[in-house]
């Protein structure tokens, strides 16, 4: 009988592994570790941090936990009331090889099973039987689920429904546009946060993060949508990518007063996160 299974391989799972000095088995439904700390690699283009943009932390214990990181330097702005103002006083932690490396490094020498999506969790006496999407099964004394709330609830509601019913907890979506230009926008900015905007939430110039891993002839931007825009479009975004890309780029170019022509777009794609971040006050 195995001891402890951890479902998910994001920061929560990595943190648990750091503090619990035991042999643990990790199961990840994707082809790699990281969770929302995700980096898109595009051949002959470069890297997009299309999940976590940066970590804001002054905690020395947390930095010790990370071990391998760097600080994102540059000019950061907030777009508010139709103007750009300085966004000061933050130390933004990133990884120069893509933010996925922040988590990936923490799982070195760990027992990780990839492409293993948990389908069902059943109590068998004093133990739990895990059934995966590939119909394989494993048994453990303890199972810890670090997946987003709704996914964790769906897997455990037969045991925990009365507990979860106490909380008003929800997770919100996000749409993330990745675009590479063959001509610089000449903004000379590292990132912009958009306050109370109908379409945009955040934009990062990837060239200011990982200069050595990006095609020198291209300028890469990751542009995240506002919550309002995400809620409106998350369920149909796969069928509407060209229109959403056009709308987000139009909003971006209008607000920042840059001219973006279609023939200047070398690469573009949009990714939807159904469970991007939490909004709750009870837990």
Describe the role of every protein-language-model region:
Residues 5-11, 18-43:
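Glycine-rich FAD pyrophosphate-binding loop
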């Amino acid at each position: 009988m195995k001891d402890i299974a951890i479902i998910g391989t994001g920061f929560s799972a990595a943190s648990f592994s750091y503090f619990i000095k035991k042999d643990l088995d990790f199961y990840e439904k994707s082809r790699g570790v990281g969770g929302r700390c995700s980096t898109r690699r595009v051949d002959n283009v470069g890297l997009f941090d299309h999940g976590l943009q940066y970590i804001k932390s002054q905690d020395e214990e947390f930095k010790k936990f990370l071990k391998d990181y760097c600080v994102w330097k540059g000019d950061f702005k907030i777009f508010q009331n139709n103007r750009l103002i300085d966004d000061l006083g933050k130390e933004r932690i990133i990884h120069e090889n893509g933010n996925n490396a922040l988590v990936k490094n923490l799982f070195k020498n760990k027992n990780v099973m990839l492409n293993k999506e948990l389908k069902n969790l059943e109590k068998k006496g004093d133990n739990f039987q895990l059934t995966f999407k590939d119909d394989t099964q494993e048994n453990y004394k303890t199972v810890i689920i670090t997946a987003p709330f709704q996914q964790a609830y769906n897997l455990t509601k037969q045991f925990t429904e009365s507990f979860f019913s106490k909380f008003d907890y929800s997770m919100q979506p996000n749409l993330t546009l990745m675009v590479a230009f063959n001509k610089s926008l000449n903004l000379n900015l590292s990132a912009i946060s958009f306050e109370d905007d109908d379409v945009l939430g955040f934009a990062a110039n990837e060239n200011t993060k990982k200069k050595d891993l990006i095609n020198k002839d291209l300028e890469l931007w990751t542009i995240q949508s506002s919550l309002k825009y995400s809620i409106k479009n998350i369920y149909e975004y796969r069928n509407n990518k060209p229109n959403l890309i056009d709308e987000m780029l139009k909003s971006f170019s209008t607000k920042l007063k840059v001219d973006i022509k279609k023939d200047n777009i070398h690469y573009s794609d949009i990714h939807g996160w159904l469970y991007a971040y939490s909004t709750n006050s009870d837990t």
